[in-house]
A protein has these predicted regions:
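Enriched for short, Lys/Arg-rich terminal
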Residues: 63-99
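Arg/Lys-rich, positively charged N-terminal/basic patches that mediate binding to nucleic acids
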Residues: 1-30
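Short, hydrophobic secondary-structure boundary micro-motifs
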Residues: 24, 46-50, 93
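A short, surface-exposed loop/turn module that caps and links secondary-structure elements
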Residues: 36-63
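Residue-level signal for well-ordered alpha-helical positions
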Residues: 11, 41, 94-97
Length: 99
């Protein structure tokens, strides 16, 4: 989804602004690695966020060394990657805003 791409760009800019180019690059690389792991093994993400928010099927794959994660659904023929959200964000509200 487009917002997931926007989230990646915005989070990368945030880390670059907060800690310089090297931190921005480390975040981007870690975020892409987490996303690729989901593409290879969709079940790797935790269903806990979906359970807590009462959103059936929602899974999250954490980004190593950063306080955020990819939120997605496993569909019959593809992955629906919804958002890349930072930990303190209200997940349910952000997903409602997407629709």
């Amino acid at each position: 989804r487009p917002l997931a791409e926007v989230d990646l760009v915005e989070r990368t800019r945030y880390y670059r602004s907060a800690g310089g180019d090297a931190l921005g690059e480390r975040f981007f690389d870690a975020a892409i690695a987490a996303l690729r792991s989901v593409e290879r093994m969709p079940g790797i993400g935790s269903p806990r966020a979906g359970e807590l928010c009462d959103i059936p099927g929602l899974r999250v794959r954490r980004v190593d060394r950063f306080p955020c994660g990819w939120y997605y659904f496993i569909l019959a023929d593809h992955l629906d990657v919804v958002r890349l959200l930072a930990d303190p964000q209200d997940i349910a509200a952000m997903l409602d805003h997407e629709d």
